[in-house]
């Protein structure tokens, strides 16, 4: 069972994480923004994994309205737009990442893609949908202090008869720590860990650059606790 935090505690976590992601934005941009700007100037450019795109094709996203929660620099949402999605909205807490998304949207030439800076738990009323598809991509759930509230946000955003699309890694991976050098990963954490992980060595998952960052918090949610919500039934 995932631990539940008060609204004040939850906001402290999400504010801290936002500050850490704001710091990470220029680090990420140094690795890929120029390349992505050039790539998105090409019609039909797509960054989505094949298995992710296969599932979205099964849903039938072409012409549908899509909200992407925690969209980062918008590359996945813009990929869907390039492949025929309808009006799209990307939402993320980090203003610098949203600025990168807006640059990519301009390069892609799409006028009906909007990016909004917002705490995911407090989405403004004028962006509350409903949408045909509400989606998150890999890594999002672990940043959510309170899953029940997060899935309630998803429920409110999704139109009746719409689709919720979640691409996520299995939480068992969070039980492991990477080994040193060529040493294998090793089991360290409980699958049922309740307290958050606290790290302050950056968020560069492109080049693996370590830097002193604001502390950021991630959370272990079991597979069962992630699948029990009504909007997923």
Regions found by a protein language model. Name each.
Residues 1-36:
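N-terminal, positively charged/glycine-rich alpha-helical extensions of SAM-dependent methyltransferases
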Residues 34-64:
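Conserved alpha-helix/loop element of class I SAM-dependent methyltransferases that forms part
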Residues 65-123:
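Class I SAM-dependent methyltransferase SAM/SAH-binding core
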Residues 121, 125-134:
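A short acidic, Gly/Pro-enriched loop at the edge of an enzyme's catalytic core
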Residues 132-148:
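A short SAM/SAH-binding and catalytic strip from SAM-dependent methyltransferases
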Residues 148-163:
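A short glycine-rich, Lys/Arg-flanked "PGG" loop and its adjoining helix->strand segment in the class I
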Residues 163-204:
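Conserved class I S-adenosyl-L-methionine
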Residues 217-233:
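Short alpha-helix
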């Amino acid at each position: 069972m995932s631990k539940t935090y008060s609204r004040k505690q939850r906001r402290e976590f999400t504010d801290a994480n936002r500050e850490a992601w704001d710091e990470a934005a220029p680090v990420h941009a140094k690795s890929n923004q120029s390349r992505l700007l050039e790539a998105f100037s090409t019609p039909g450019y797509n960054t989505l994994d094949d298995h992710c795109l296969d599932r979205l094709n099964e849903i039938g996203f072409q012409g549908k309205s899509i909200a992407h929660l925690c969209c980062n620099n918008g590359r996945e949402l813009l990929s869907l737009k390039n492949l025929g999605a309808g009006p799209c909205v990307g939402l993320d807490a980090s203003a610098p990442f949203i600025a990168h998304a807006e640059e990519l949207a301009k390069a892609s030439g799409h006028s009906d893609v909007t990016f909004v800076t917002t705490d995911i738990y407090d989405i403004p009323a004028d962006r509350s949908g409903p949408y045909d598809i509400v989606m998150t991509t890999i890594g999002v759930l672990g940043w959510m202090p309170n899953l029940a509230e997060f899935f309630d946000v998803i429920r409110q955003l999704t139109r009746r008869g719409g689709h919720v699309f979640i691409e996520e890694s299995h939480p068992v991976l969070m039980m492991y720590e990477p080994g040193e050098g060529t040493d294998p990963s090793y089991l360290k954490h409980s699958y049922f860990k309740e307290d958050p992980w606290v790290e302050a060595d950056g968020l560069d998952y492109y080049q693996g650059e370590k830097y002193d960052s604001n502390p950021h918090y991630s959370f272990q949610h079991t597979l069962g606790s992630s699948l029990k919500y009504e909007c997923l039934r």
